[in-house]
């Protein structure tokens, strides 16, 4: 959706102050060649199917909160965007065996999300809120917050929609910086931020009463985070236990579990069973400590200082490494991002030069992209 112009940003631009975004800084740290093409040559390149469909989901969710869309608009909008993207040649990556498993999982996850989405009470919610943040060294960042909630005590909860897989390892800190900047930006504007969170749309949190271990004597509340397309298989053993306790016979249990695994829906189960399980959106909080803020501030200032020192010479902007070292010490190609996600993958001279040196097996992988 189109954003309205903000006087604060216009004043910064008119005064010649460089205004960055966290996504721009991430691009600079990921691949200088990509950043050079995008931000110096002002060439945005091509999108990818994840970005196109993800943006559509964001737009409709924003429209629902603002009263411009309803829950029933979600699924048709996503399916139409997916169809149009594929007609234009955008594709999901293939599995190693050449199958469409990645596409199938993503589509199943998002279809389940769209079909089960319940809109929140729009009271005290706002979308696409602009923030402007000034770092300790005076560098300026701007961005827009997907969703924020004003609490009764005046504090704010920040939410960021994600259609990606869960973050793990170092990815948590890397992606967490976006939430940290959101919080610091609002705090500079005088707000009190209570929490920052991701809402991972491909996942659900399922709560139910059960025994956590085989040695447990009492039932306690169990919470499991499950990918939507795997609900049936991941939760089958817990559903089976409930049905056994409620006295269902073996045949009825087998029939119910088969349908449950196929549908990934608790609604196909007997009501006495389904009410034992509560399915919620997966809201993943990110803890923002003083140390986390300091790391983010240093990341911002060091990245911008490095970027502004490079000048206009293209040779100062090398590409990311096209290989990685495995645990066994073997060097292998590592070009998934370049061929599937980068906006300049099809035109990158560095990638073309690298692939020209590879054997036919890897070159075939590249040819599949184009």
Predicted feature descriptions by range:
Residues 1-370:
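RecB-family 4Fe-4S metal-dependent nuclease core
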């Amino acid at each position: 959706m189109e954003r309205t112009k903000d006087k604060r940003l216009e004043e910064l631009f008119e005064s010649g102050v460089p205004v960055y975004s966290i996504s721009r800084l991430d691009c600079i740290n990921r691949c200088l060649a990509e950043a050079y093409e995008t931000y110096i040559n002002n060439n945005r390149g091509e999108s990818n199917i994840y970005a196109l469909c993800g943006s559509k989901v964001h737009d409709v969710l924003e429209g629902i909160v603002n009263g411009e869309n309803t829950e029933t608009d979600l699924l048709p909008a996503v399916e139409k965007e997916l169809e149009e993207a594929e007609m234009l040649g955008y594709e999901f990556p293939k599995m190693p065996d050449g199958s469409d498993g990645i596409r199938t999982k993503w589509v199943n996850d998002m279809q389940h999300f769209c079909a089960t989405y319940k809109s929140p009470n729009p009271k005290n919610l706002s979308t696409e809120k602009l923030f402007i943040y000034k770092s300790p060294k005076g560098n300026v960042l701007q961005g827009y917050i997907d969703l924020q909630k004003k609490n009764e005590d005046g504090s704010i909860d920040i939410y960021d929609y994600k259609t990606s897989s869960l973050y793990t390892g170092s990815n948590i800190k890397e992606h967490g910086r976006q939430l940290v900047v959101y919080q610091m930006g609002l705090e500079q504007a005088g707000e009190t931020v209570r929490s920052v969170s991701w809402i991972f749309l491909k996942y659900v949190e399922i709560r139910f009463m059960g025994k956590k271990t085989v040695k447990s004597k009492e039932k306690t509340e169990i919470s499991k985070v499950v990918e939507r397309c795997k609900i049936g298989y991941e939760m089958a053993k817990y559903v089976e236990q409930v049905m056994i306790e409620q006295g269902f016979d073996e045949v009825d249990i087998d029939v119910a579990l088969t349908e449950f695994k196929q549908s990934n829906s608790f609604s196909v189960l007997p009501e006495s069973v389904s009410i034992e399980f509560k399915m919620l959106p997966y809201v993943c909080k990110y803890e923002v400590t003083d140390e986390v803020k300091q790391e983010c501030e240093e990341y911002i200032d060091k990245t911008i200082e490095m970027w502004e020192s490079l000048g206009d010479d293209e040779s100062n902007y090398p590409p990311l490494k096209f290989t990685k070292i495995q645990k066994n010490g073997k060097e292998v190609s590592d070009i998934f991002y370049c061929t599937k996600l980068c906006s300049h993958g099809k035109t990158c001279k560095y990638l073309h030069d690298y692939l020209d040196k590879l054997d036919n097996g890897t070159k075939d992988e590249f040819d599949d992209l184009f």
